[in-house]
UniProtKB/Swiss-Prot annotation:
Disulfide bonds join 142-219. The chain crosses the membrane at residues 69-93, 107-131, 143-165, 186-207, 231-255, 280-306, 315-338. Residues 1-68, 132-142, 208-230, 307-314 are extracellular. A motif (NPxxY) lies at residues 334-338. The modification Phosphotyrosine is found at residue 168. The lineage of its organism: Eukaryota, Metazoa, Chordata, Craniata, Vertebrata. InterPro entries: GPCR_Rhodpsn (IPR000276), GPCR_Rhodpsn_7TM (IPR017452), Mu_opioid_rcpt (IPR000105), Opioid_rcpt (IPR001418). The gene is OPRM1. It is a multi-pass membrane protein. Phosphorylated. Differentially phosphorylated in basal and agonist-induced conditions. Agonist-mediated phosphorylation modulates receptor internalization. Phosphorylated by GRK2 in a agonist-dependent manner. Phosphorylation at Tyr-168 requires receptor activation, is dependent on non-receptor protein tyrosine kinase Src and results in a decrease in agonist efficacy by reducing G-protein coupling efficiency. Phosphorylated on tyrosine residues; the phosphorylation is involved in agonist-induced G-protein-independent receptor down-regulation. This is Mu-type opioid receptor. Residues 364-400 are annotated as: Disordered.
């Protein structure tokens, strides 16, 4: 997710389990995972502890809130990783597998699932980094993990903006929507969203590197001199372009849609189409709302930290990691939302998880028809096979 502003070494305590003194706090340019949003807050022993005097007592012993925080975050990251990977890959499979799912809206959902699947795949690396207090995976993986965080953040919010504009066109300009809202156009727009995200993702990939510090390795972003200026500039740009502007666009689109839905009884000539239109609009609105709820705390926290000095306390550290975890949690929530809010996704998920005899028959029938087209001479054999299957079903059918 947002790897843009947090220290790379999520735990700058050289080993809270074995040592009683904290290593120096990360430098302003050091970042890790979502914590990349703020260069000083990823130390579970408490940010900038050495600035307060470097006393041994400032690094909590085993069993203290820092260890509880570490265990809690590890458990949460594990759940998010498993649910996020399985759920998002299932969403992508369903959209690719079923022809009826290849709509413009679902093409955007595929893009969102791809970005979420990529970022959840980085959580095991970040968890190891957090627990060990060092980055053991090398420079290349460091660059990949940090850039994926940024790509996910920007691609996700750009895709949600696109979905909101798409819904606005479908609801408020249904005639124009016939030409604009096509799967082909949706795929082109998805590619454009990834290209736009590269404006941040690629520079971050080049800036990411590993540095040796006090016996440990940090996966960090390096800034040109003066580093404080470029670091804060990056935070402000992320806040504006990955949060403020997209939220304003989404708010305007849904404000206009709500006015339209209230003023018009029938959006189309069919009650069924009208019901589907409102249902899909509601689903997209919920997905957008959940995204904003999950990402608002970390964006606000980072921008406040960039502008004012926040006292270093255990509560601050716990709050910081909670904001990071909340941002990552969003990546596993979307598949759950689709399953509850969209009947088509719900049906396809059910068919995938619990194959029924009718689904198997339908798949076999599809394969048989395909084989018949490829080999016309086998048509008679296929007919006989179908007849035998029908007889077998009649024989094995339960008695009334």
């Amino acid at each position: 997710m947002d790897s843009s502003a947090v220290p790379t070494n999520a735990s700058n305590c050289t080993d809270a389990l074995a040592h009683s003194s904290c290593s120096p706090a990360p430098s302003p340019g050091s970042w890790v995972n979502l914590s990349h949003l703020d260069g000083n807050l990823s130390d579970p022993c408490g940010p900038n502890r050495t600035d307060l005097g470097g006393r041994d007592s400032l690094c909590p012993p085993t069993g203290s809130p820092s260890m509880i925080t570490a265990i809690t975050i590890m458990a949460l990251y594990s759940i998010v990783c498993v649910v996020g990977l399985f759920g998002n890959f299932l969403v992508m499979y369903v959209i690719v597998r079923y022809t009826k799912m290849k709509t413009a809206t679902n093409i955007y959902i595929f893009n969102l699932a791809l970005a979420d699947a990529l970022v959840t795949s980085t959580l095991p690396f970040q968890s190891v980094n957090y627990l060990m207090g060092t980055w053991p995976f090398g420079t290349i993986l460091c660059k990949i993990v940090i850039s994926i965080d940024y790509y996910n953040m920007f691609t996700s919010i750009f895709t949600l903006c696109t979905m909101s504009v798409d819904r606005y066109i479908a609801v408020c300009h249904p005639v124009k929507a016939l030409d604009f809202r096509t799967p082909r156009n949706a795929k082109i727009i998805n590619v454009c969203n990834w290209i736009l995200s590269s404006a941040i993702g690629l520079p971050v990939m080049f800036m990411a590197t590993t540095k040796y510090r006090q016996g440990s390795i940090d996966c960090t972003l390096t800034f040109s001199h003066p580093s404080w200026y470029w670091e804060n500039l990056l935070k402000i740009c992320v806040f504006i372009f990955a949060f403020i502007m997209p939220v304003l666009i989404i708010t305007v689109c849904y404000g206009l849609m709500i006015l339209r839905l209230k003023s018009v009884r029938m959006l189309s000539g069919s009650k069924e189409k009208d019901r589907n239109l409102r249902r899909i609009t509601r689903m997209v609105l919920v997905v957008v709302a959940v995204f904003i709820i999950c990402w608002t705390p970390i964006h606000i926290y980072v921008i406040i930290k960039a502008l004012v000095t926040i006292p270093e306390t255990t509560l601050q550290t716990v709050s910081w990691h909670f904001c990071i975890a909340l941002g990552y949690t969003n990546s596993c929530l979307n598949p759950v939302l689709y399953a509850f809010l969209d009947e088509n996704f719900k049906r396809c998920f059910r068919e995938f998880c619990i194959p029924t005899s009718s689904n198997i028959e339908q798949q076999n029938s599809t394969r048989i028809r395909q084989n018949t087209r490829d080999h016309p001479s086998t048509a008679n054999t296929v007919d006989r096979t179908n007849h035998q299957l029908e007889n077998l079903e009649a024989e094995t059918a339960p008695l009334p």
